[in-house]
């Protein structure tokens, strides 16, 4: 009889491999499976990562196939096509939706009790696709959403104020994409509202918000320009979500979940535990933020309506 937690990752690319390493290093799982169409690639990644076994808690790791997903507590999907020159965003979405049509039924077949965590981009749209294809309750299909974006926001504010990022409490909400935005009115520095902190330290709040918002939006583009992809921070973000689920922490994370209309996935602060989504904690927003959130959700709904499911 299996003891401990089992986490499976589908996709052995830069992100999937980094997530595999992060989960192994965390000690959260006793069993880890990495699945990829290129079995040799998955085997190579598992060999490389597992050779660090002497430095971490005992964990069984293997490169497997879909049947090896059996008894997984969480299945993380990172697989997907990259956007090609001249290819539209909708073309890419339909291509990845087609890939999900081959993946998700296999996940449900072999791991029907698992939480599905989607990381592939565009994550909100593909989380909705996974939800529809799986037939699972919405609470058991999550997207990584804006957990990483929110970490970037906290990093930027912490660097600005020379503080520990763990004491900055702020969330990016909406789409994981161009229509996302910081929920500034709910941001806290320690236990102080950001606006009060700025007033006390003679900081121009409007200027700060504009500058930091731009900086956070551009982080991923700058990284991609320099190294071609992002993989480490998203791996840590996913590890944090996995931790909240496996340890039943009821943590508040800005994962992507189904909205109340049932027509789109988007990110707001959400309580996450062993059953996935427990509830959304939508903070009170000012009029401008409420409008931005509505517009972001509309962008996602319109995109989803065009998908070939």
Question: Where do the model's predicted regions map?
Answer:
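N-terminal Rossmann-fold NAD(P) dinucleotide-binding loop
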Residues: 16-17
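Glycine-rich Rossmann-fold phosphate-binding loop(s) that bind the pyrophosphate
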Residues: 12-13
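Conserved N-terminal Rossmann-fold NAD(P) cofactor-binding segment
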Residues: 31, 35-72, 87, 305
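C-terminal substrate-binding/catalytic lobe of Rossmann-fold NAD(P)-dependent dehydrogenases
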Residues: 134-140, 149-309
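Conserved S-adenosyl-L-methionine
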Residues: 25-31, 135-137
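Gly/Ala-rich phosphate-binding loop of Rossmann-like dinucleotide-binding domains
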Residues: 20, 24
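Conserved NAD(P)H cofactor-binding loop of Rossmann-fold oxidoreductase domains
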Residues: 79-81
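Rossmann-like NAD(P)(H) cofactor-binding subdomain of soluble oxidoreductases
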Residues: 89-154
